Amino acid sequence: MKTKKATAVLATAIVLALSASACGGSDSKDDNSKGGGAGIDAGLTSVVNKSDKKGGTVTFEHSDVPDSLDPGNTYYGWVQNFSRLYGRTLTSFKPAAGKEGLEVVPDLAESLGESSPDAKTWTYKLRKGVKFDDGSPVTSKDVKYAIERSNFAPEALSHGPTYFKAYLEGGEDYKGPYKDKSPEGLKSIETPDDQTIIFKLNKPFADFDYLATFSQTAPVPQARDKGAEYVQAMASSGPYKFESYNEGRSATLVRNPHWDQATDPIRPALADKITIKFKVNPTTVDQHLMSDNITVDAAGTGLQTKTQPKVLTKATEKAKTDNSYAGATSYLALSTKVKPFDNADCRKAVQYAIDKASVQAALGGDTKGDVASTLLPPTVNGYQKFDLYQTEGNKGDVAKAKAALADCGQPDGFKTNLTARSDRPDEVQMATAIQASLKEVGIQAEIKQYPSGKYFGNFAGVPSYVKEHDLGMMMMAWGADWPTGFGFLDQIVNGSAIKPSGGNNLMELDDPTINKALSDGIAQTDAAARTKAWGEVDKLVMENASVVPLIYRKNLLYRPDSATNVTVTQAYLGMYDYLLIGSTT
């Protein structure tokens, strides 16, 4: 892997090359005018094949189905990115290259939130003139309703996070709009007029502008809501609306005639049409990218391990790649509610047993990520470097693992189940490497595969299913909801995030010390104090030993020649920014 210095030199050279190309005019027809001609990692620091030309079709493919394309019922990072095409949120991340893309900017709101001194009251003013695809005006009441349905109606919408429920006054008692028919709804969200929305919190929340970027703040008119069926005919507040939607198969988006560029400073909306197809074999997705038959792999996690040699060994193909840090960690979740992982020493045995170097190799080597020792990845604010379960060369320590097994009363090892997502070959290969490591210390792990689209809603994210089927170990990959330690940690280690289904705290970790540390940290109005707090929470989690960090993820992204306005966004897990991207086809 290149050193930071070498990468910086390369990035500088790329920027200079792009500047020289731009001076020559934008009508050049040579390869440097195409998405693939800018050079290796060009998309990390610049917008490749920059264009303001409207027209064409941007085509996406995905190896599985989404949890949902409903902005109020999703937790997948790629859907958060994709849904901005049809759903405007109160705030958003700036569509821009490099670190500029981490800046939070107003979207549906006129400006960032106005906070009270104690960070418990947040006020936003909506832009005037924003309309839904049927021509009706977007109001503050539509934003309020969107939050009510997305956070308080698990009987219909179970996939998204529950930050609003946890932090809004009275959130623990409100039953959601499908059960509570009172016209005022949740009283801690006030809408004194059509342009103003006020949030009253039960505790300080200094990251609220980040929370407002979440797709759950995309407005929903109550009259058009059909609960779980809303996804079949969603209202659009963005530049695109759904022309067709075939559940689990495909969708087509076309221009929203009532979208007004004057009200939307962050969306260029270049393409005339956007299509997405689901359940495409992941290797086929790679082939379609490399043959320029599609614009984007929607998952945004990069080329498959078996595809990588085809691009990395050929200079012209390698020049079309961006090896981005994903701001994400792959880890093994150990269920604290499934024996013998209710015993901390049994969890520590797994920490020492796993040969992380072999896991990295199974994933595809350092192109796909670095060996991890913490839950927080280095690119997220609050990261502190430490390793509580260090082994030589990251290859595991059989002796320490067996000693921990003896301490937990399992000297001969034990049997358990290990889950992975069936449509993610790299994850299955990682699980297979883990299985081999565990076998060396007497732990027999049977791999159970489930589809990613149902992984959290039906299997690993359902505590009753986990216990019934003895799913002691679960493969997991997680990226920050927003790029701070709280935005990364809260929904995966806070006890309040445990849900009947669709949960992401797969360990069912509910440690009062960790829960309090998270609450105390987000209440800090001093940024430096917040940053320090997240590293301390990370250490508490690692001391608990229910999370085995495996890899700080990297994506080997590929940009076909027809793609325009291509740049990596760290705000959305190191994938390409879907708001910017266009196509010459």
Residue ranges and their predicted role:
Residues S19-A22:
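C-terminal motif of bacterial Sec signal peptides marking the signal peptidase cleavage site
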Residues D41-A42, N246, A353-Q384, D426-A436, ...:
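Detector for C-terminal structural segments
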Residues T59, V138-E148, D194-P204, G238-P239, ...:
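Alpha-helical secondary-structure segments
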Residues E61-P117, A235:
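N-terminal lobe/hinge region of extracytoplasmic solute-binding protein
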Residues K94-K99, K175, Q195, K200-A269, ...:
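Gly/Pro-rich hinge or "lid" segments in bacterial periplasmic/extracellular proteins
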Residues K125, D142-K144, R149-V220, N246:
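Surface-exposed binding/hinge segments that line
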Residues R224-M234, W259-V311:
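Ligand-site clamp/hinge motif
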Residues Y240, T367-D407, S422-Q429:
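Structural transition elements
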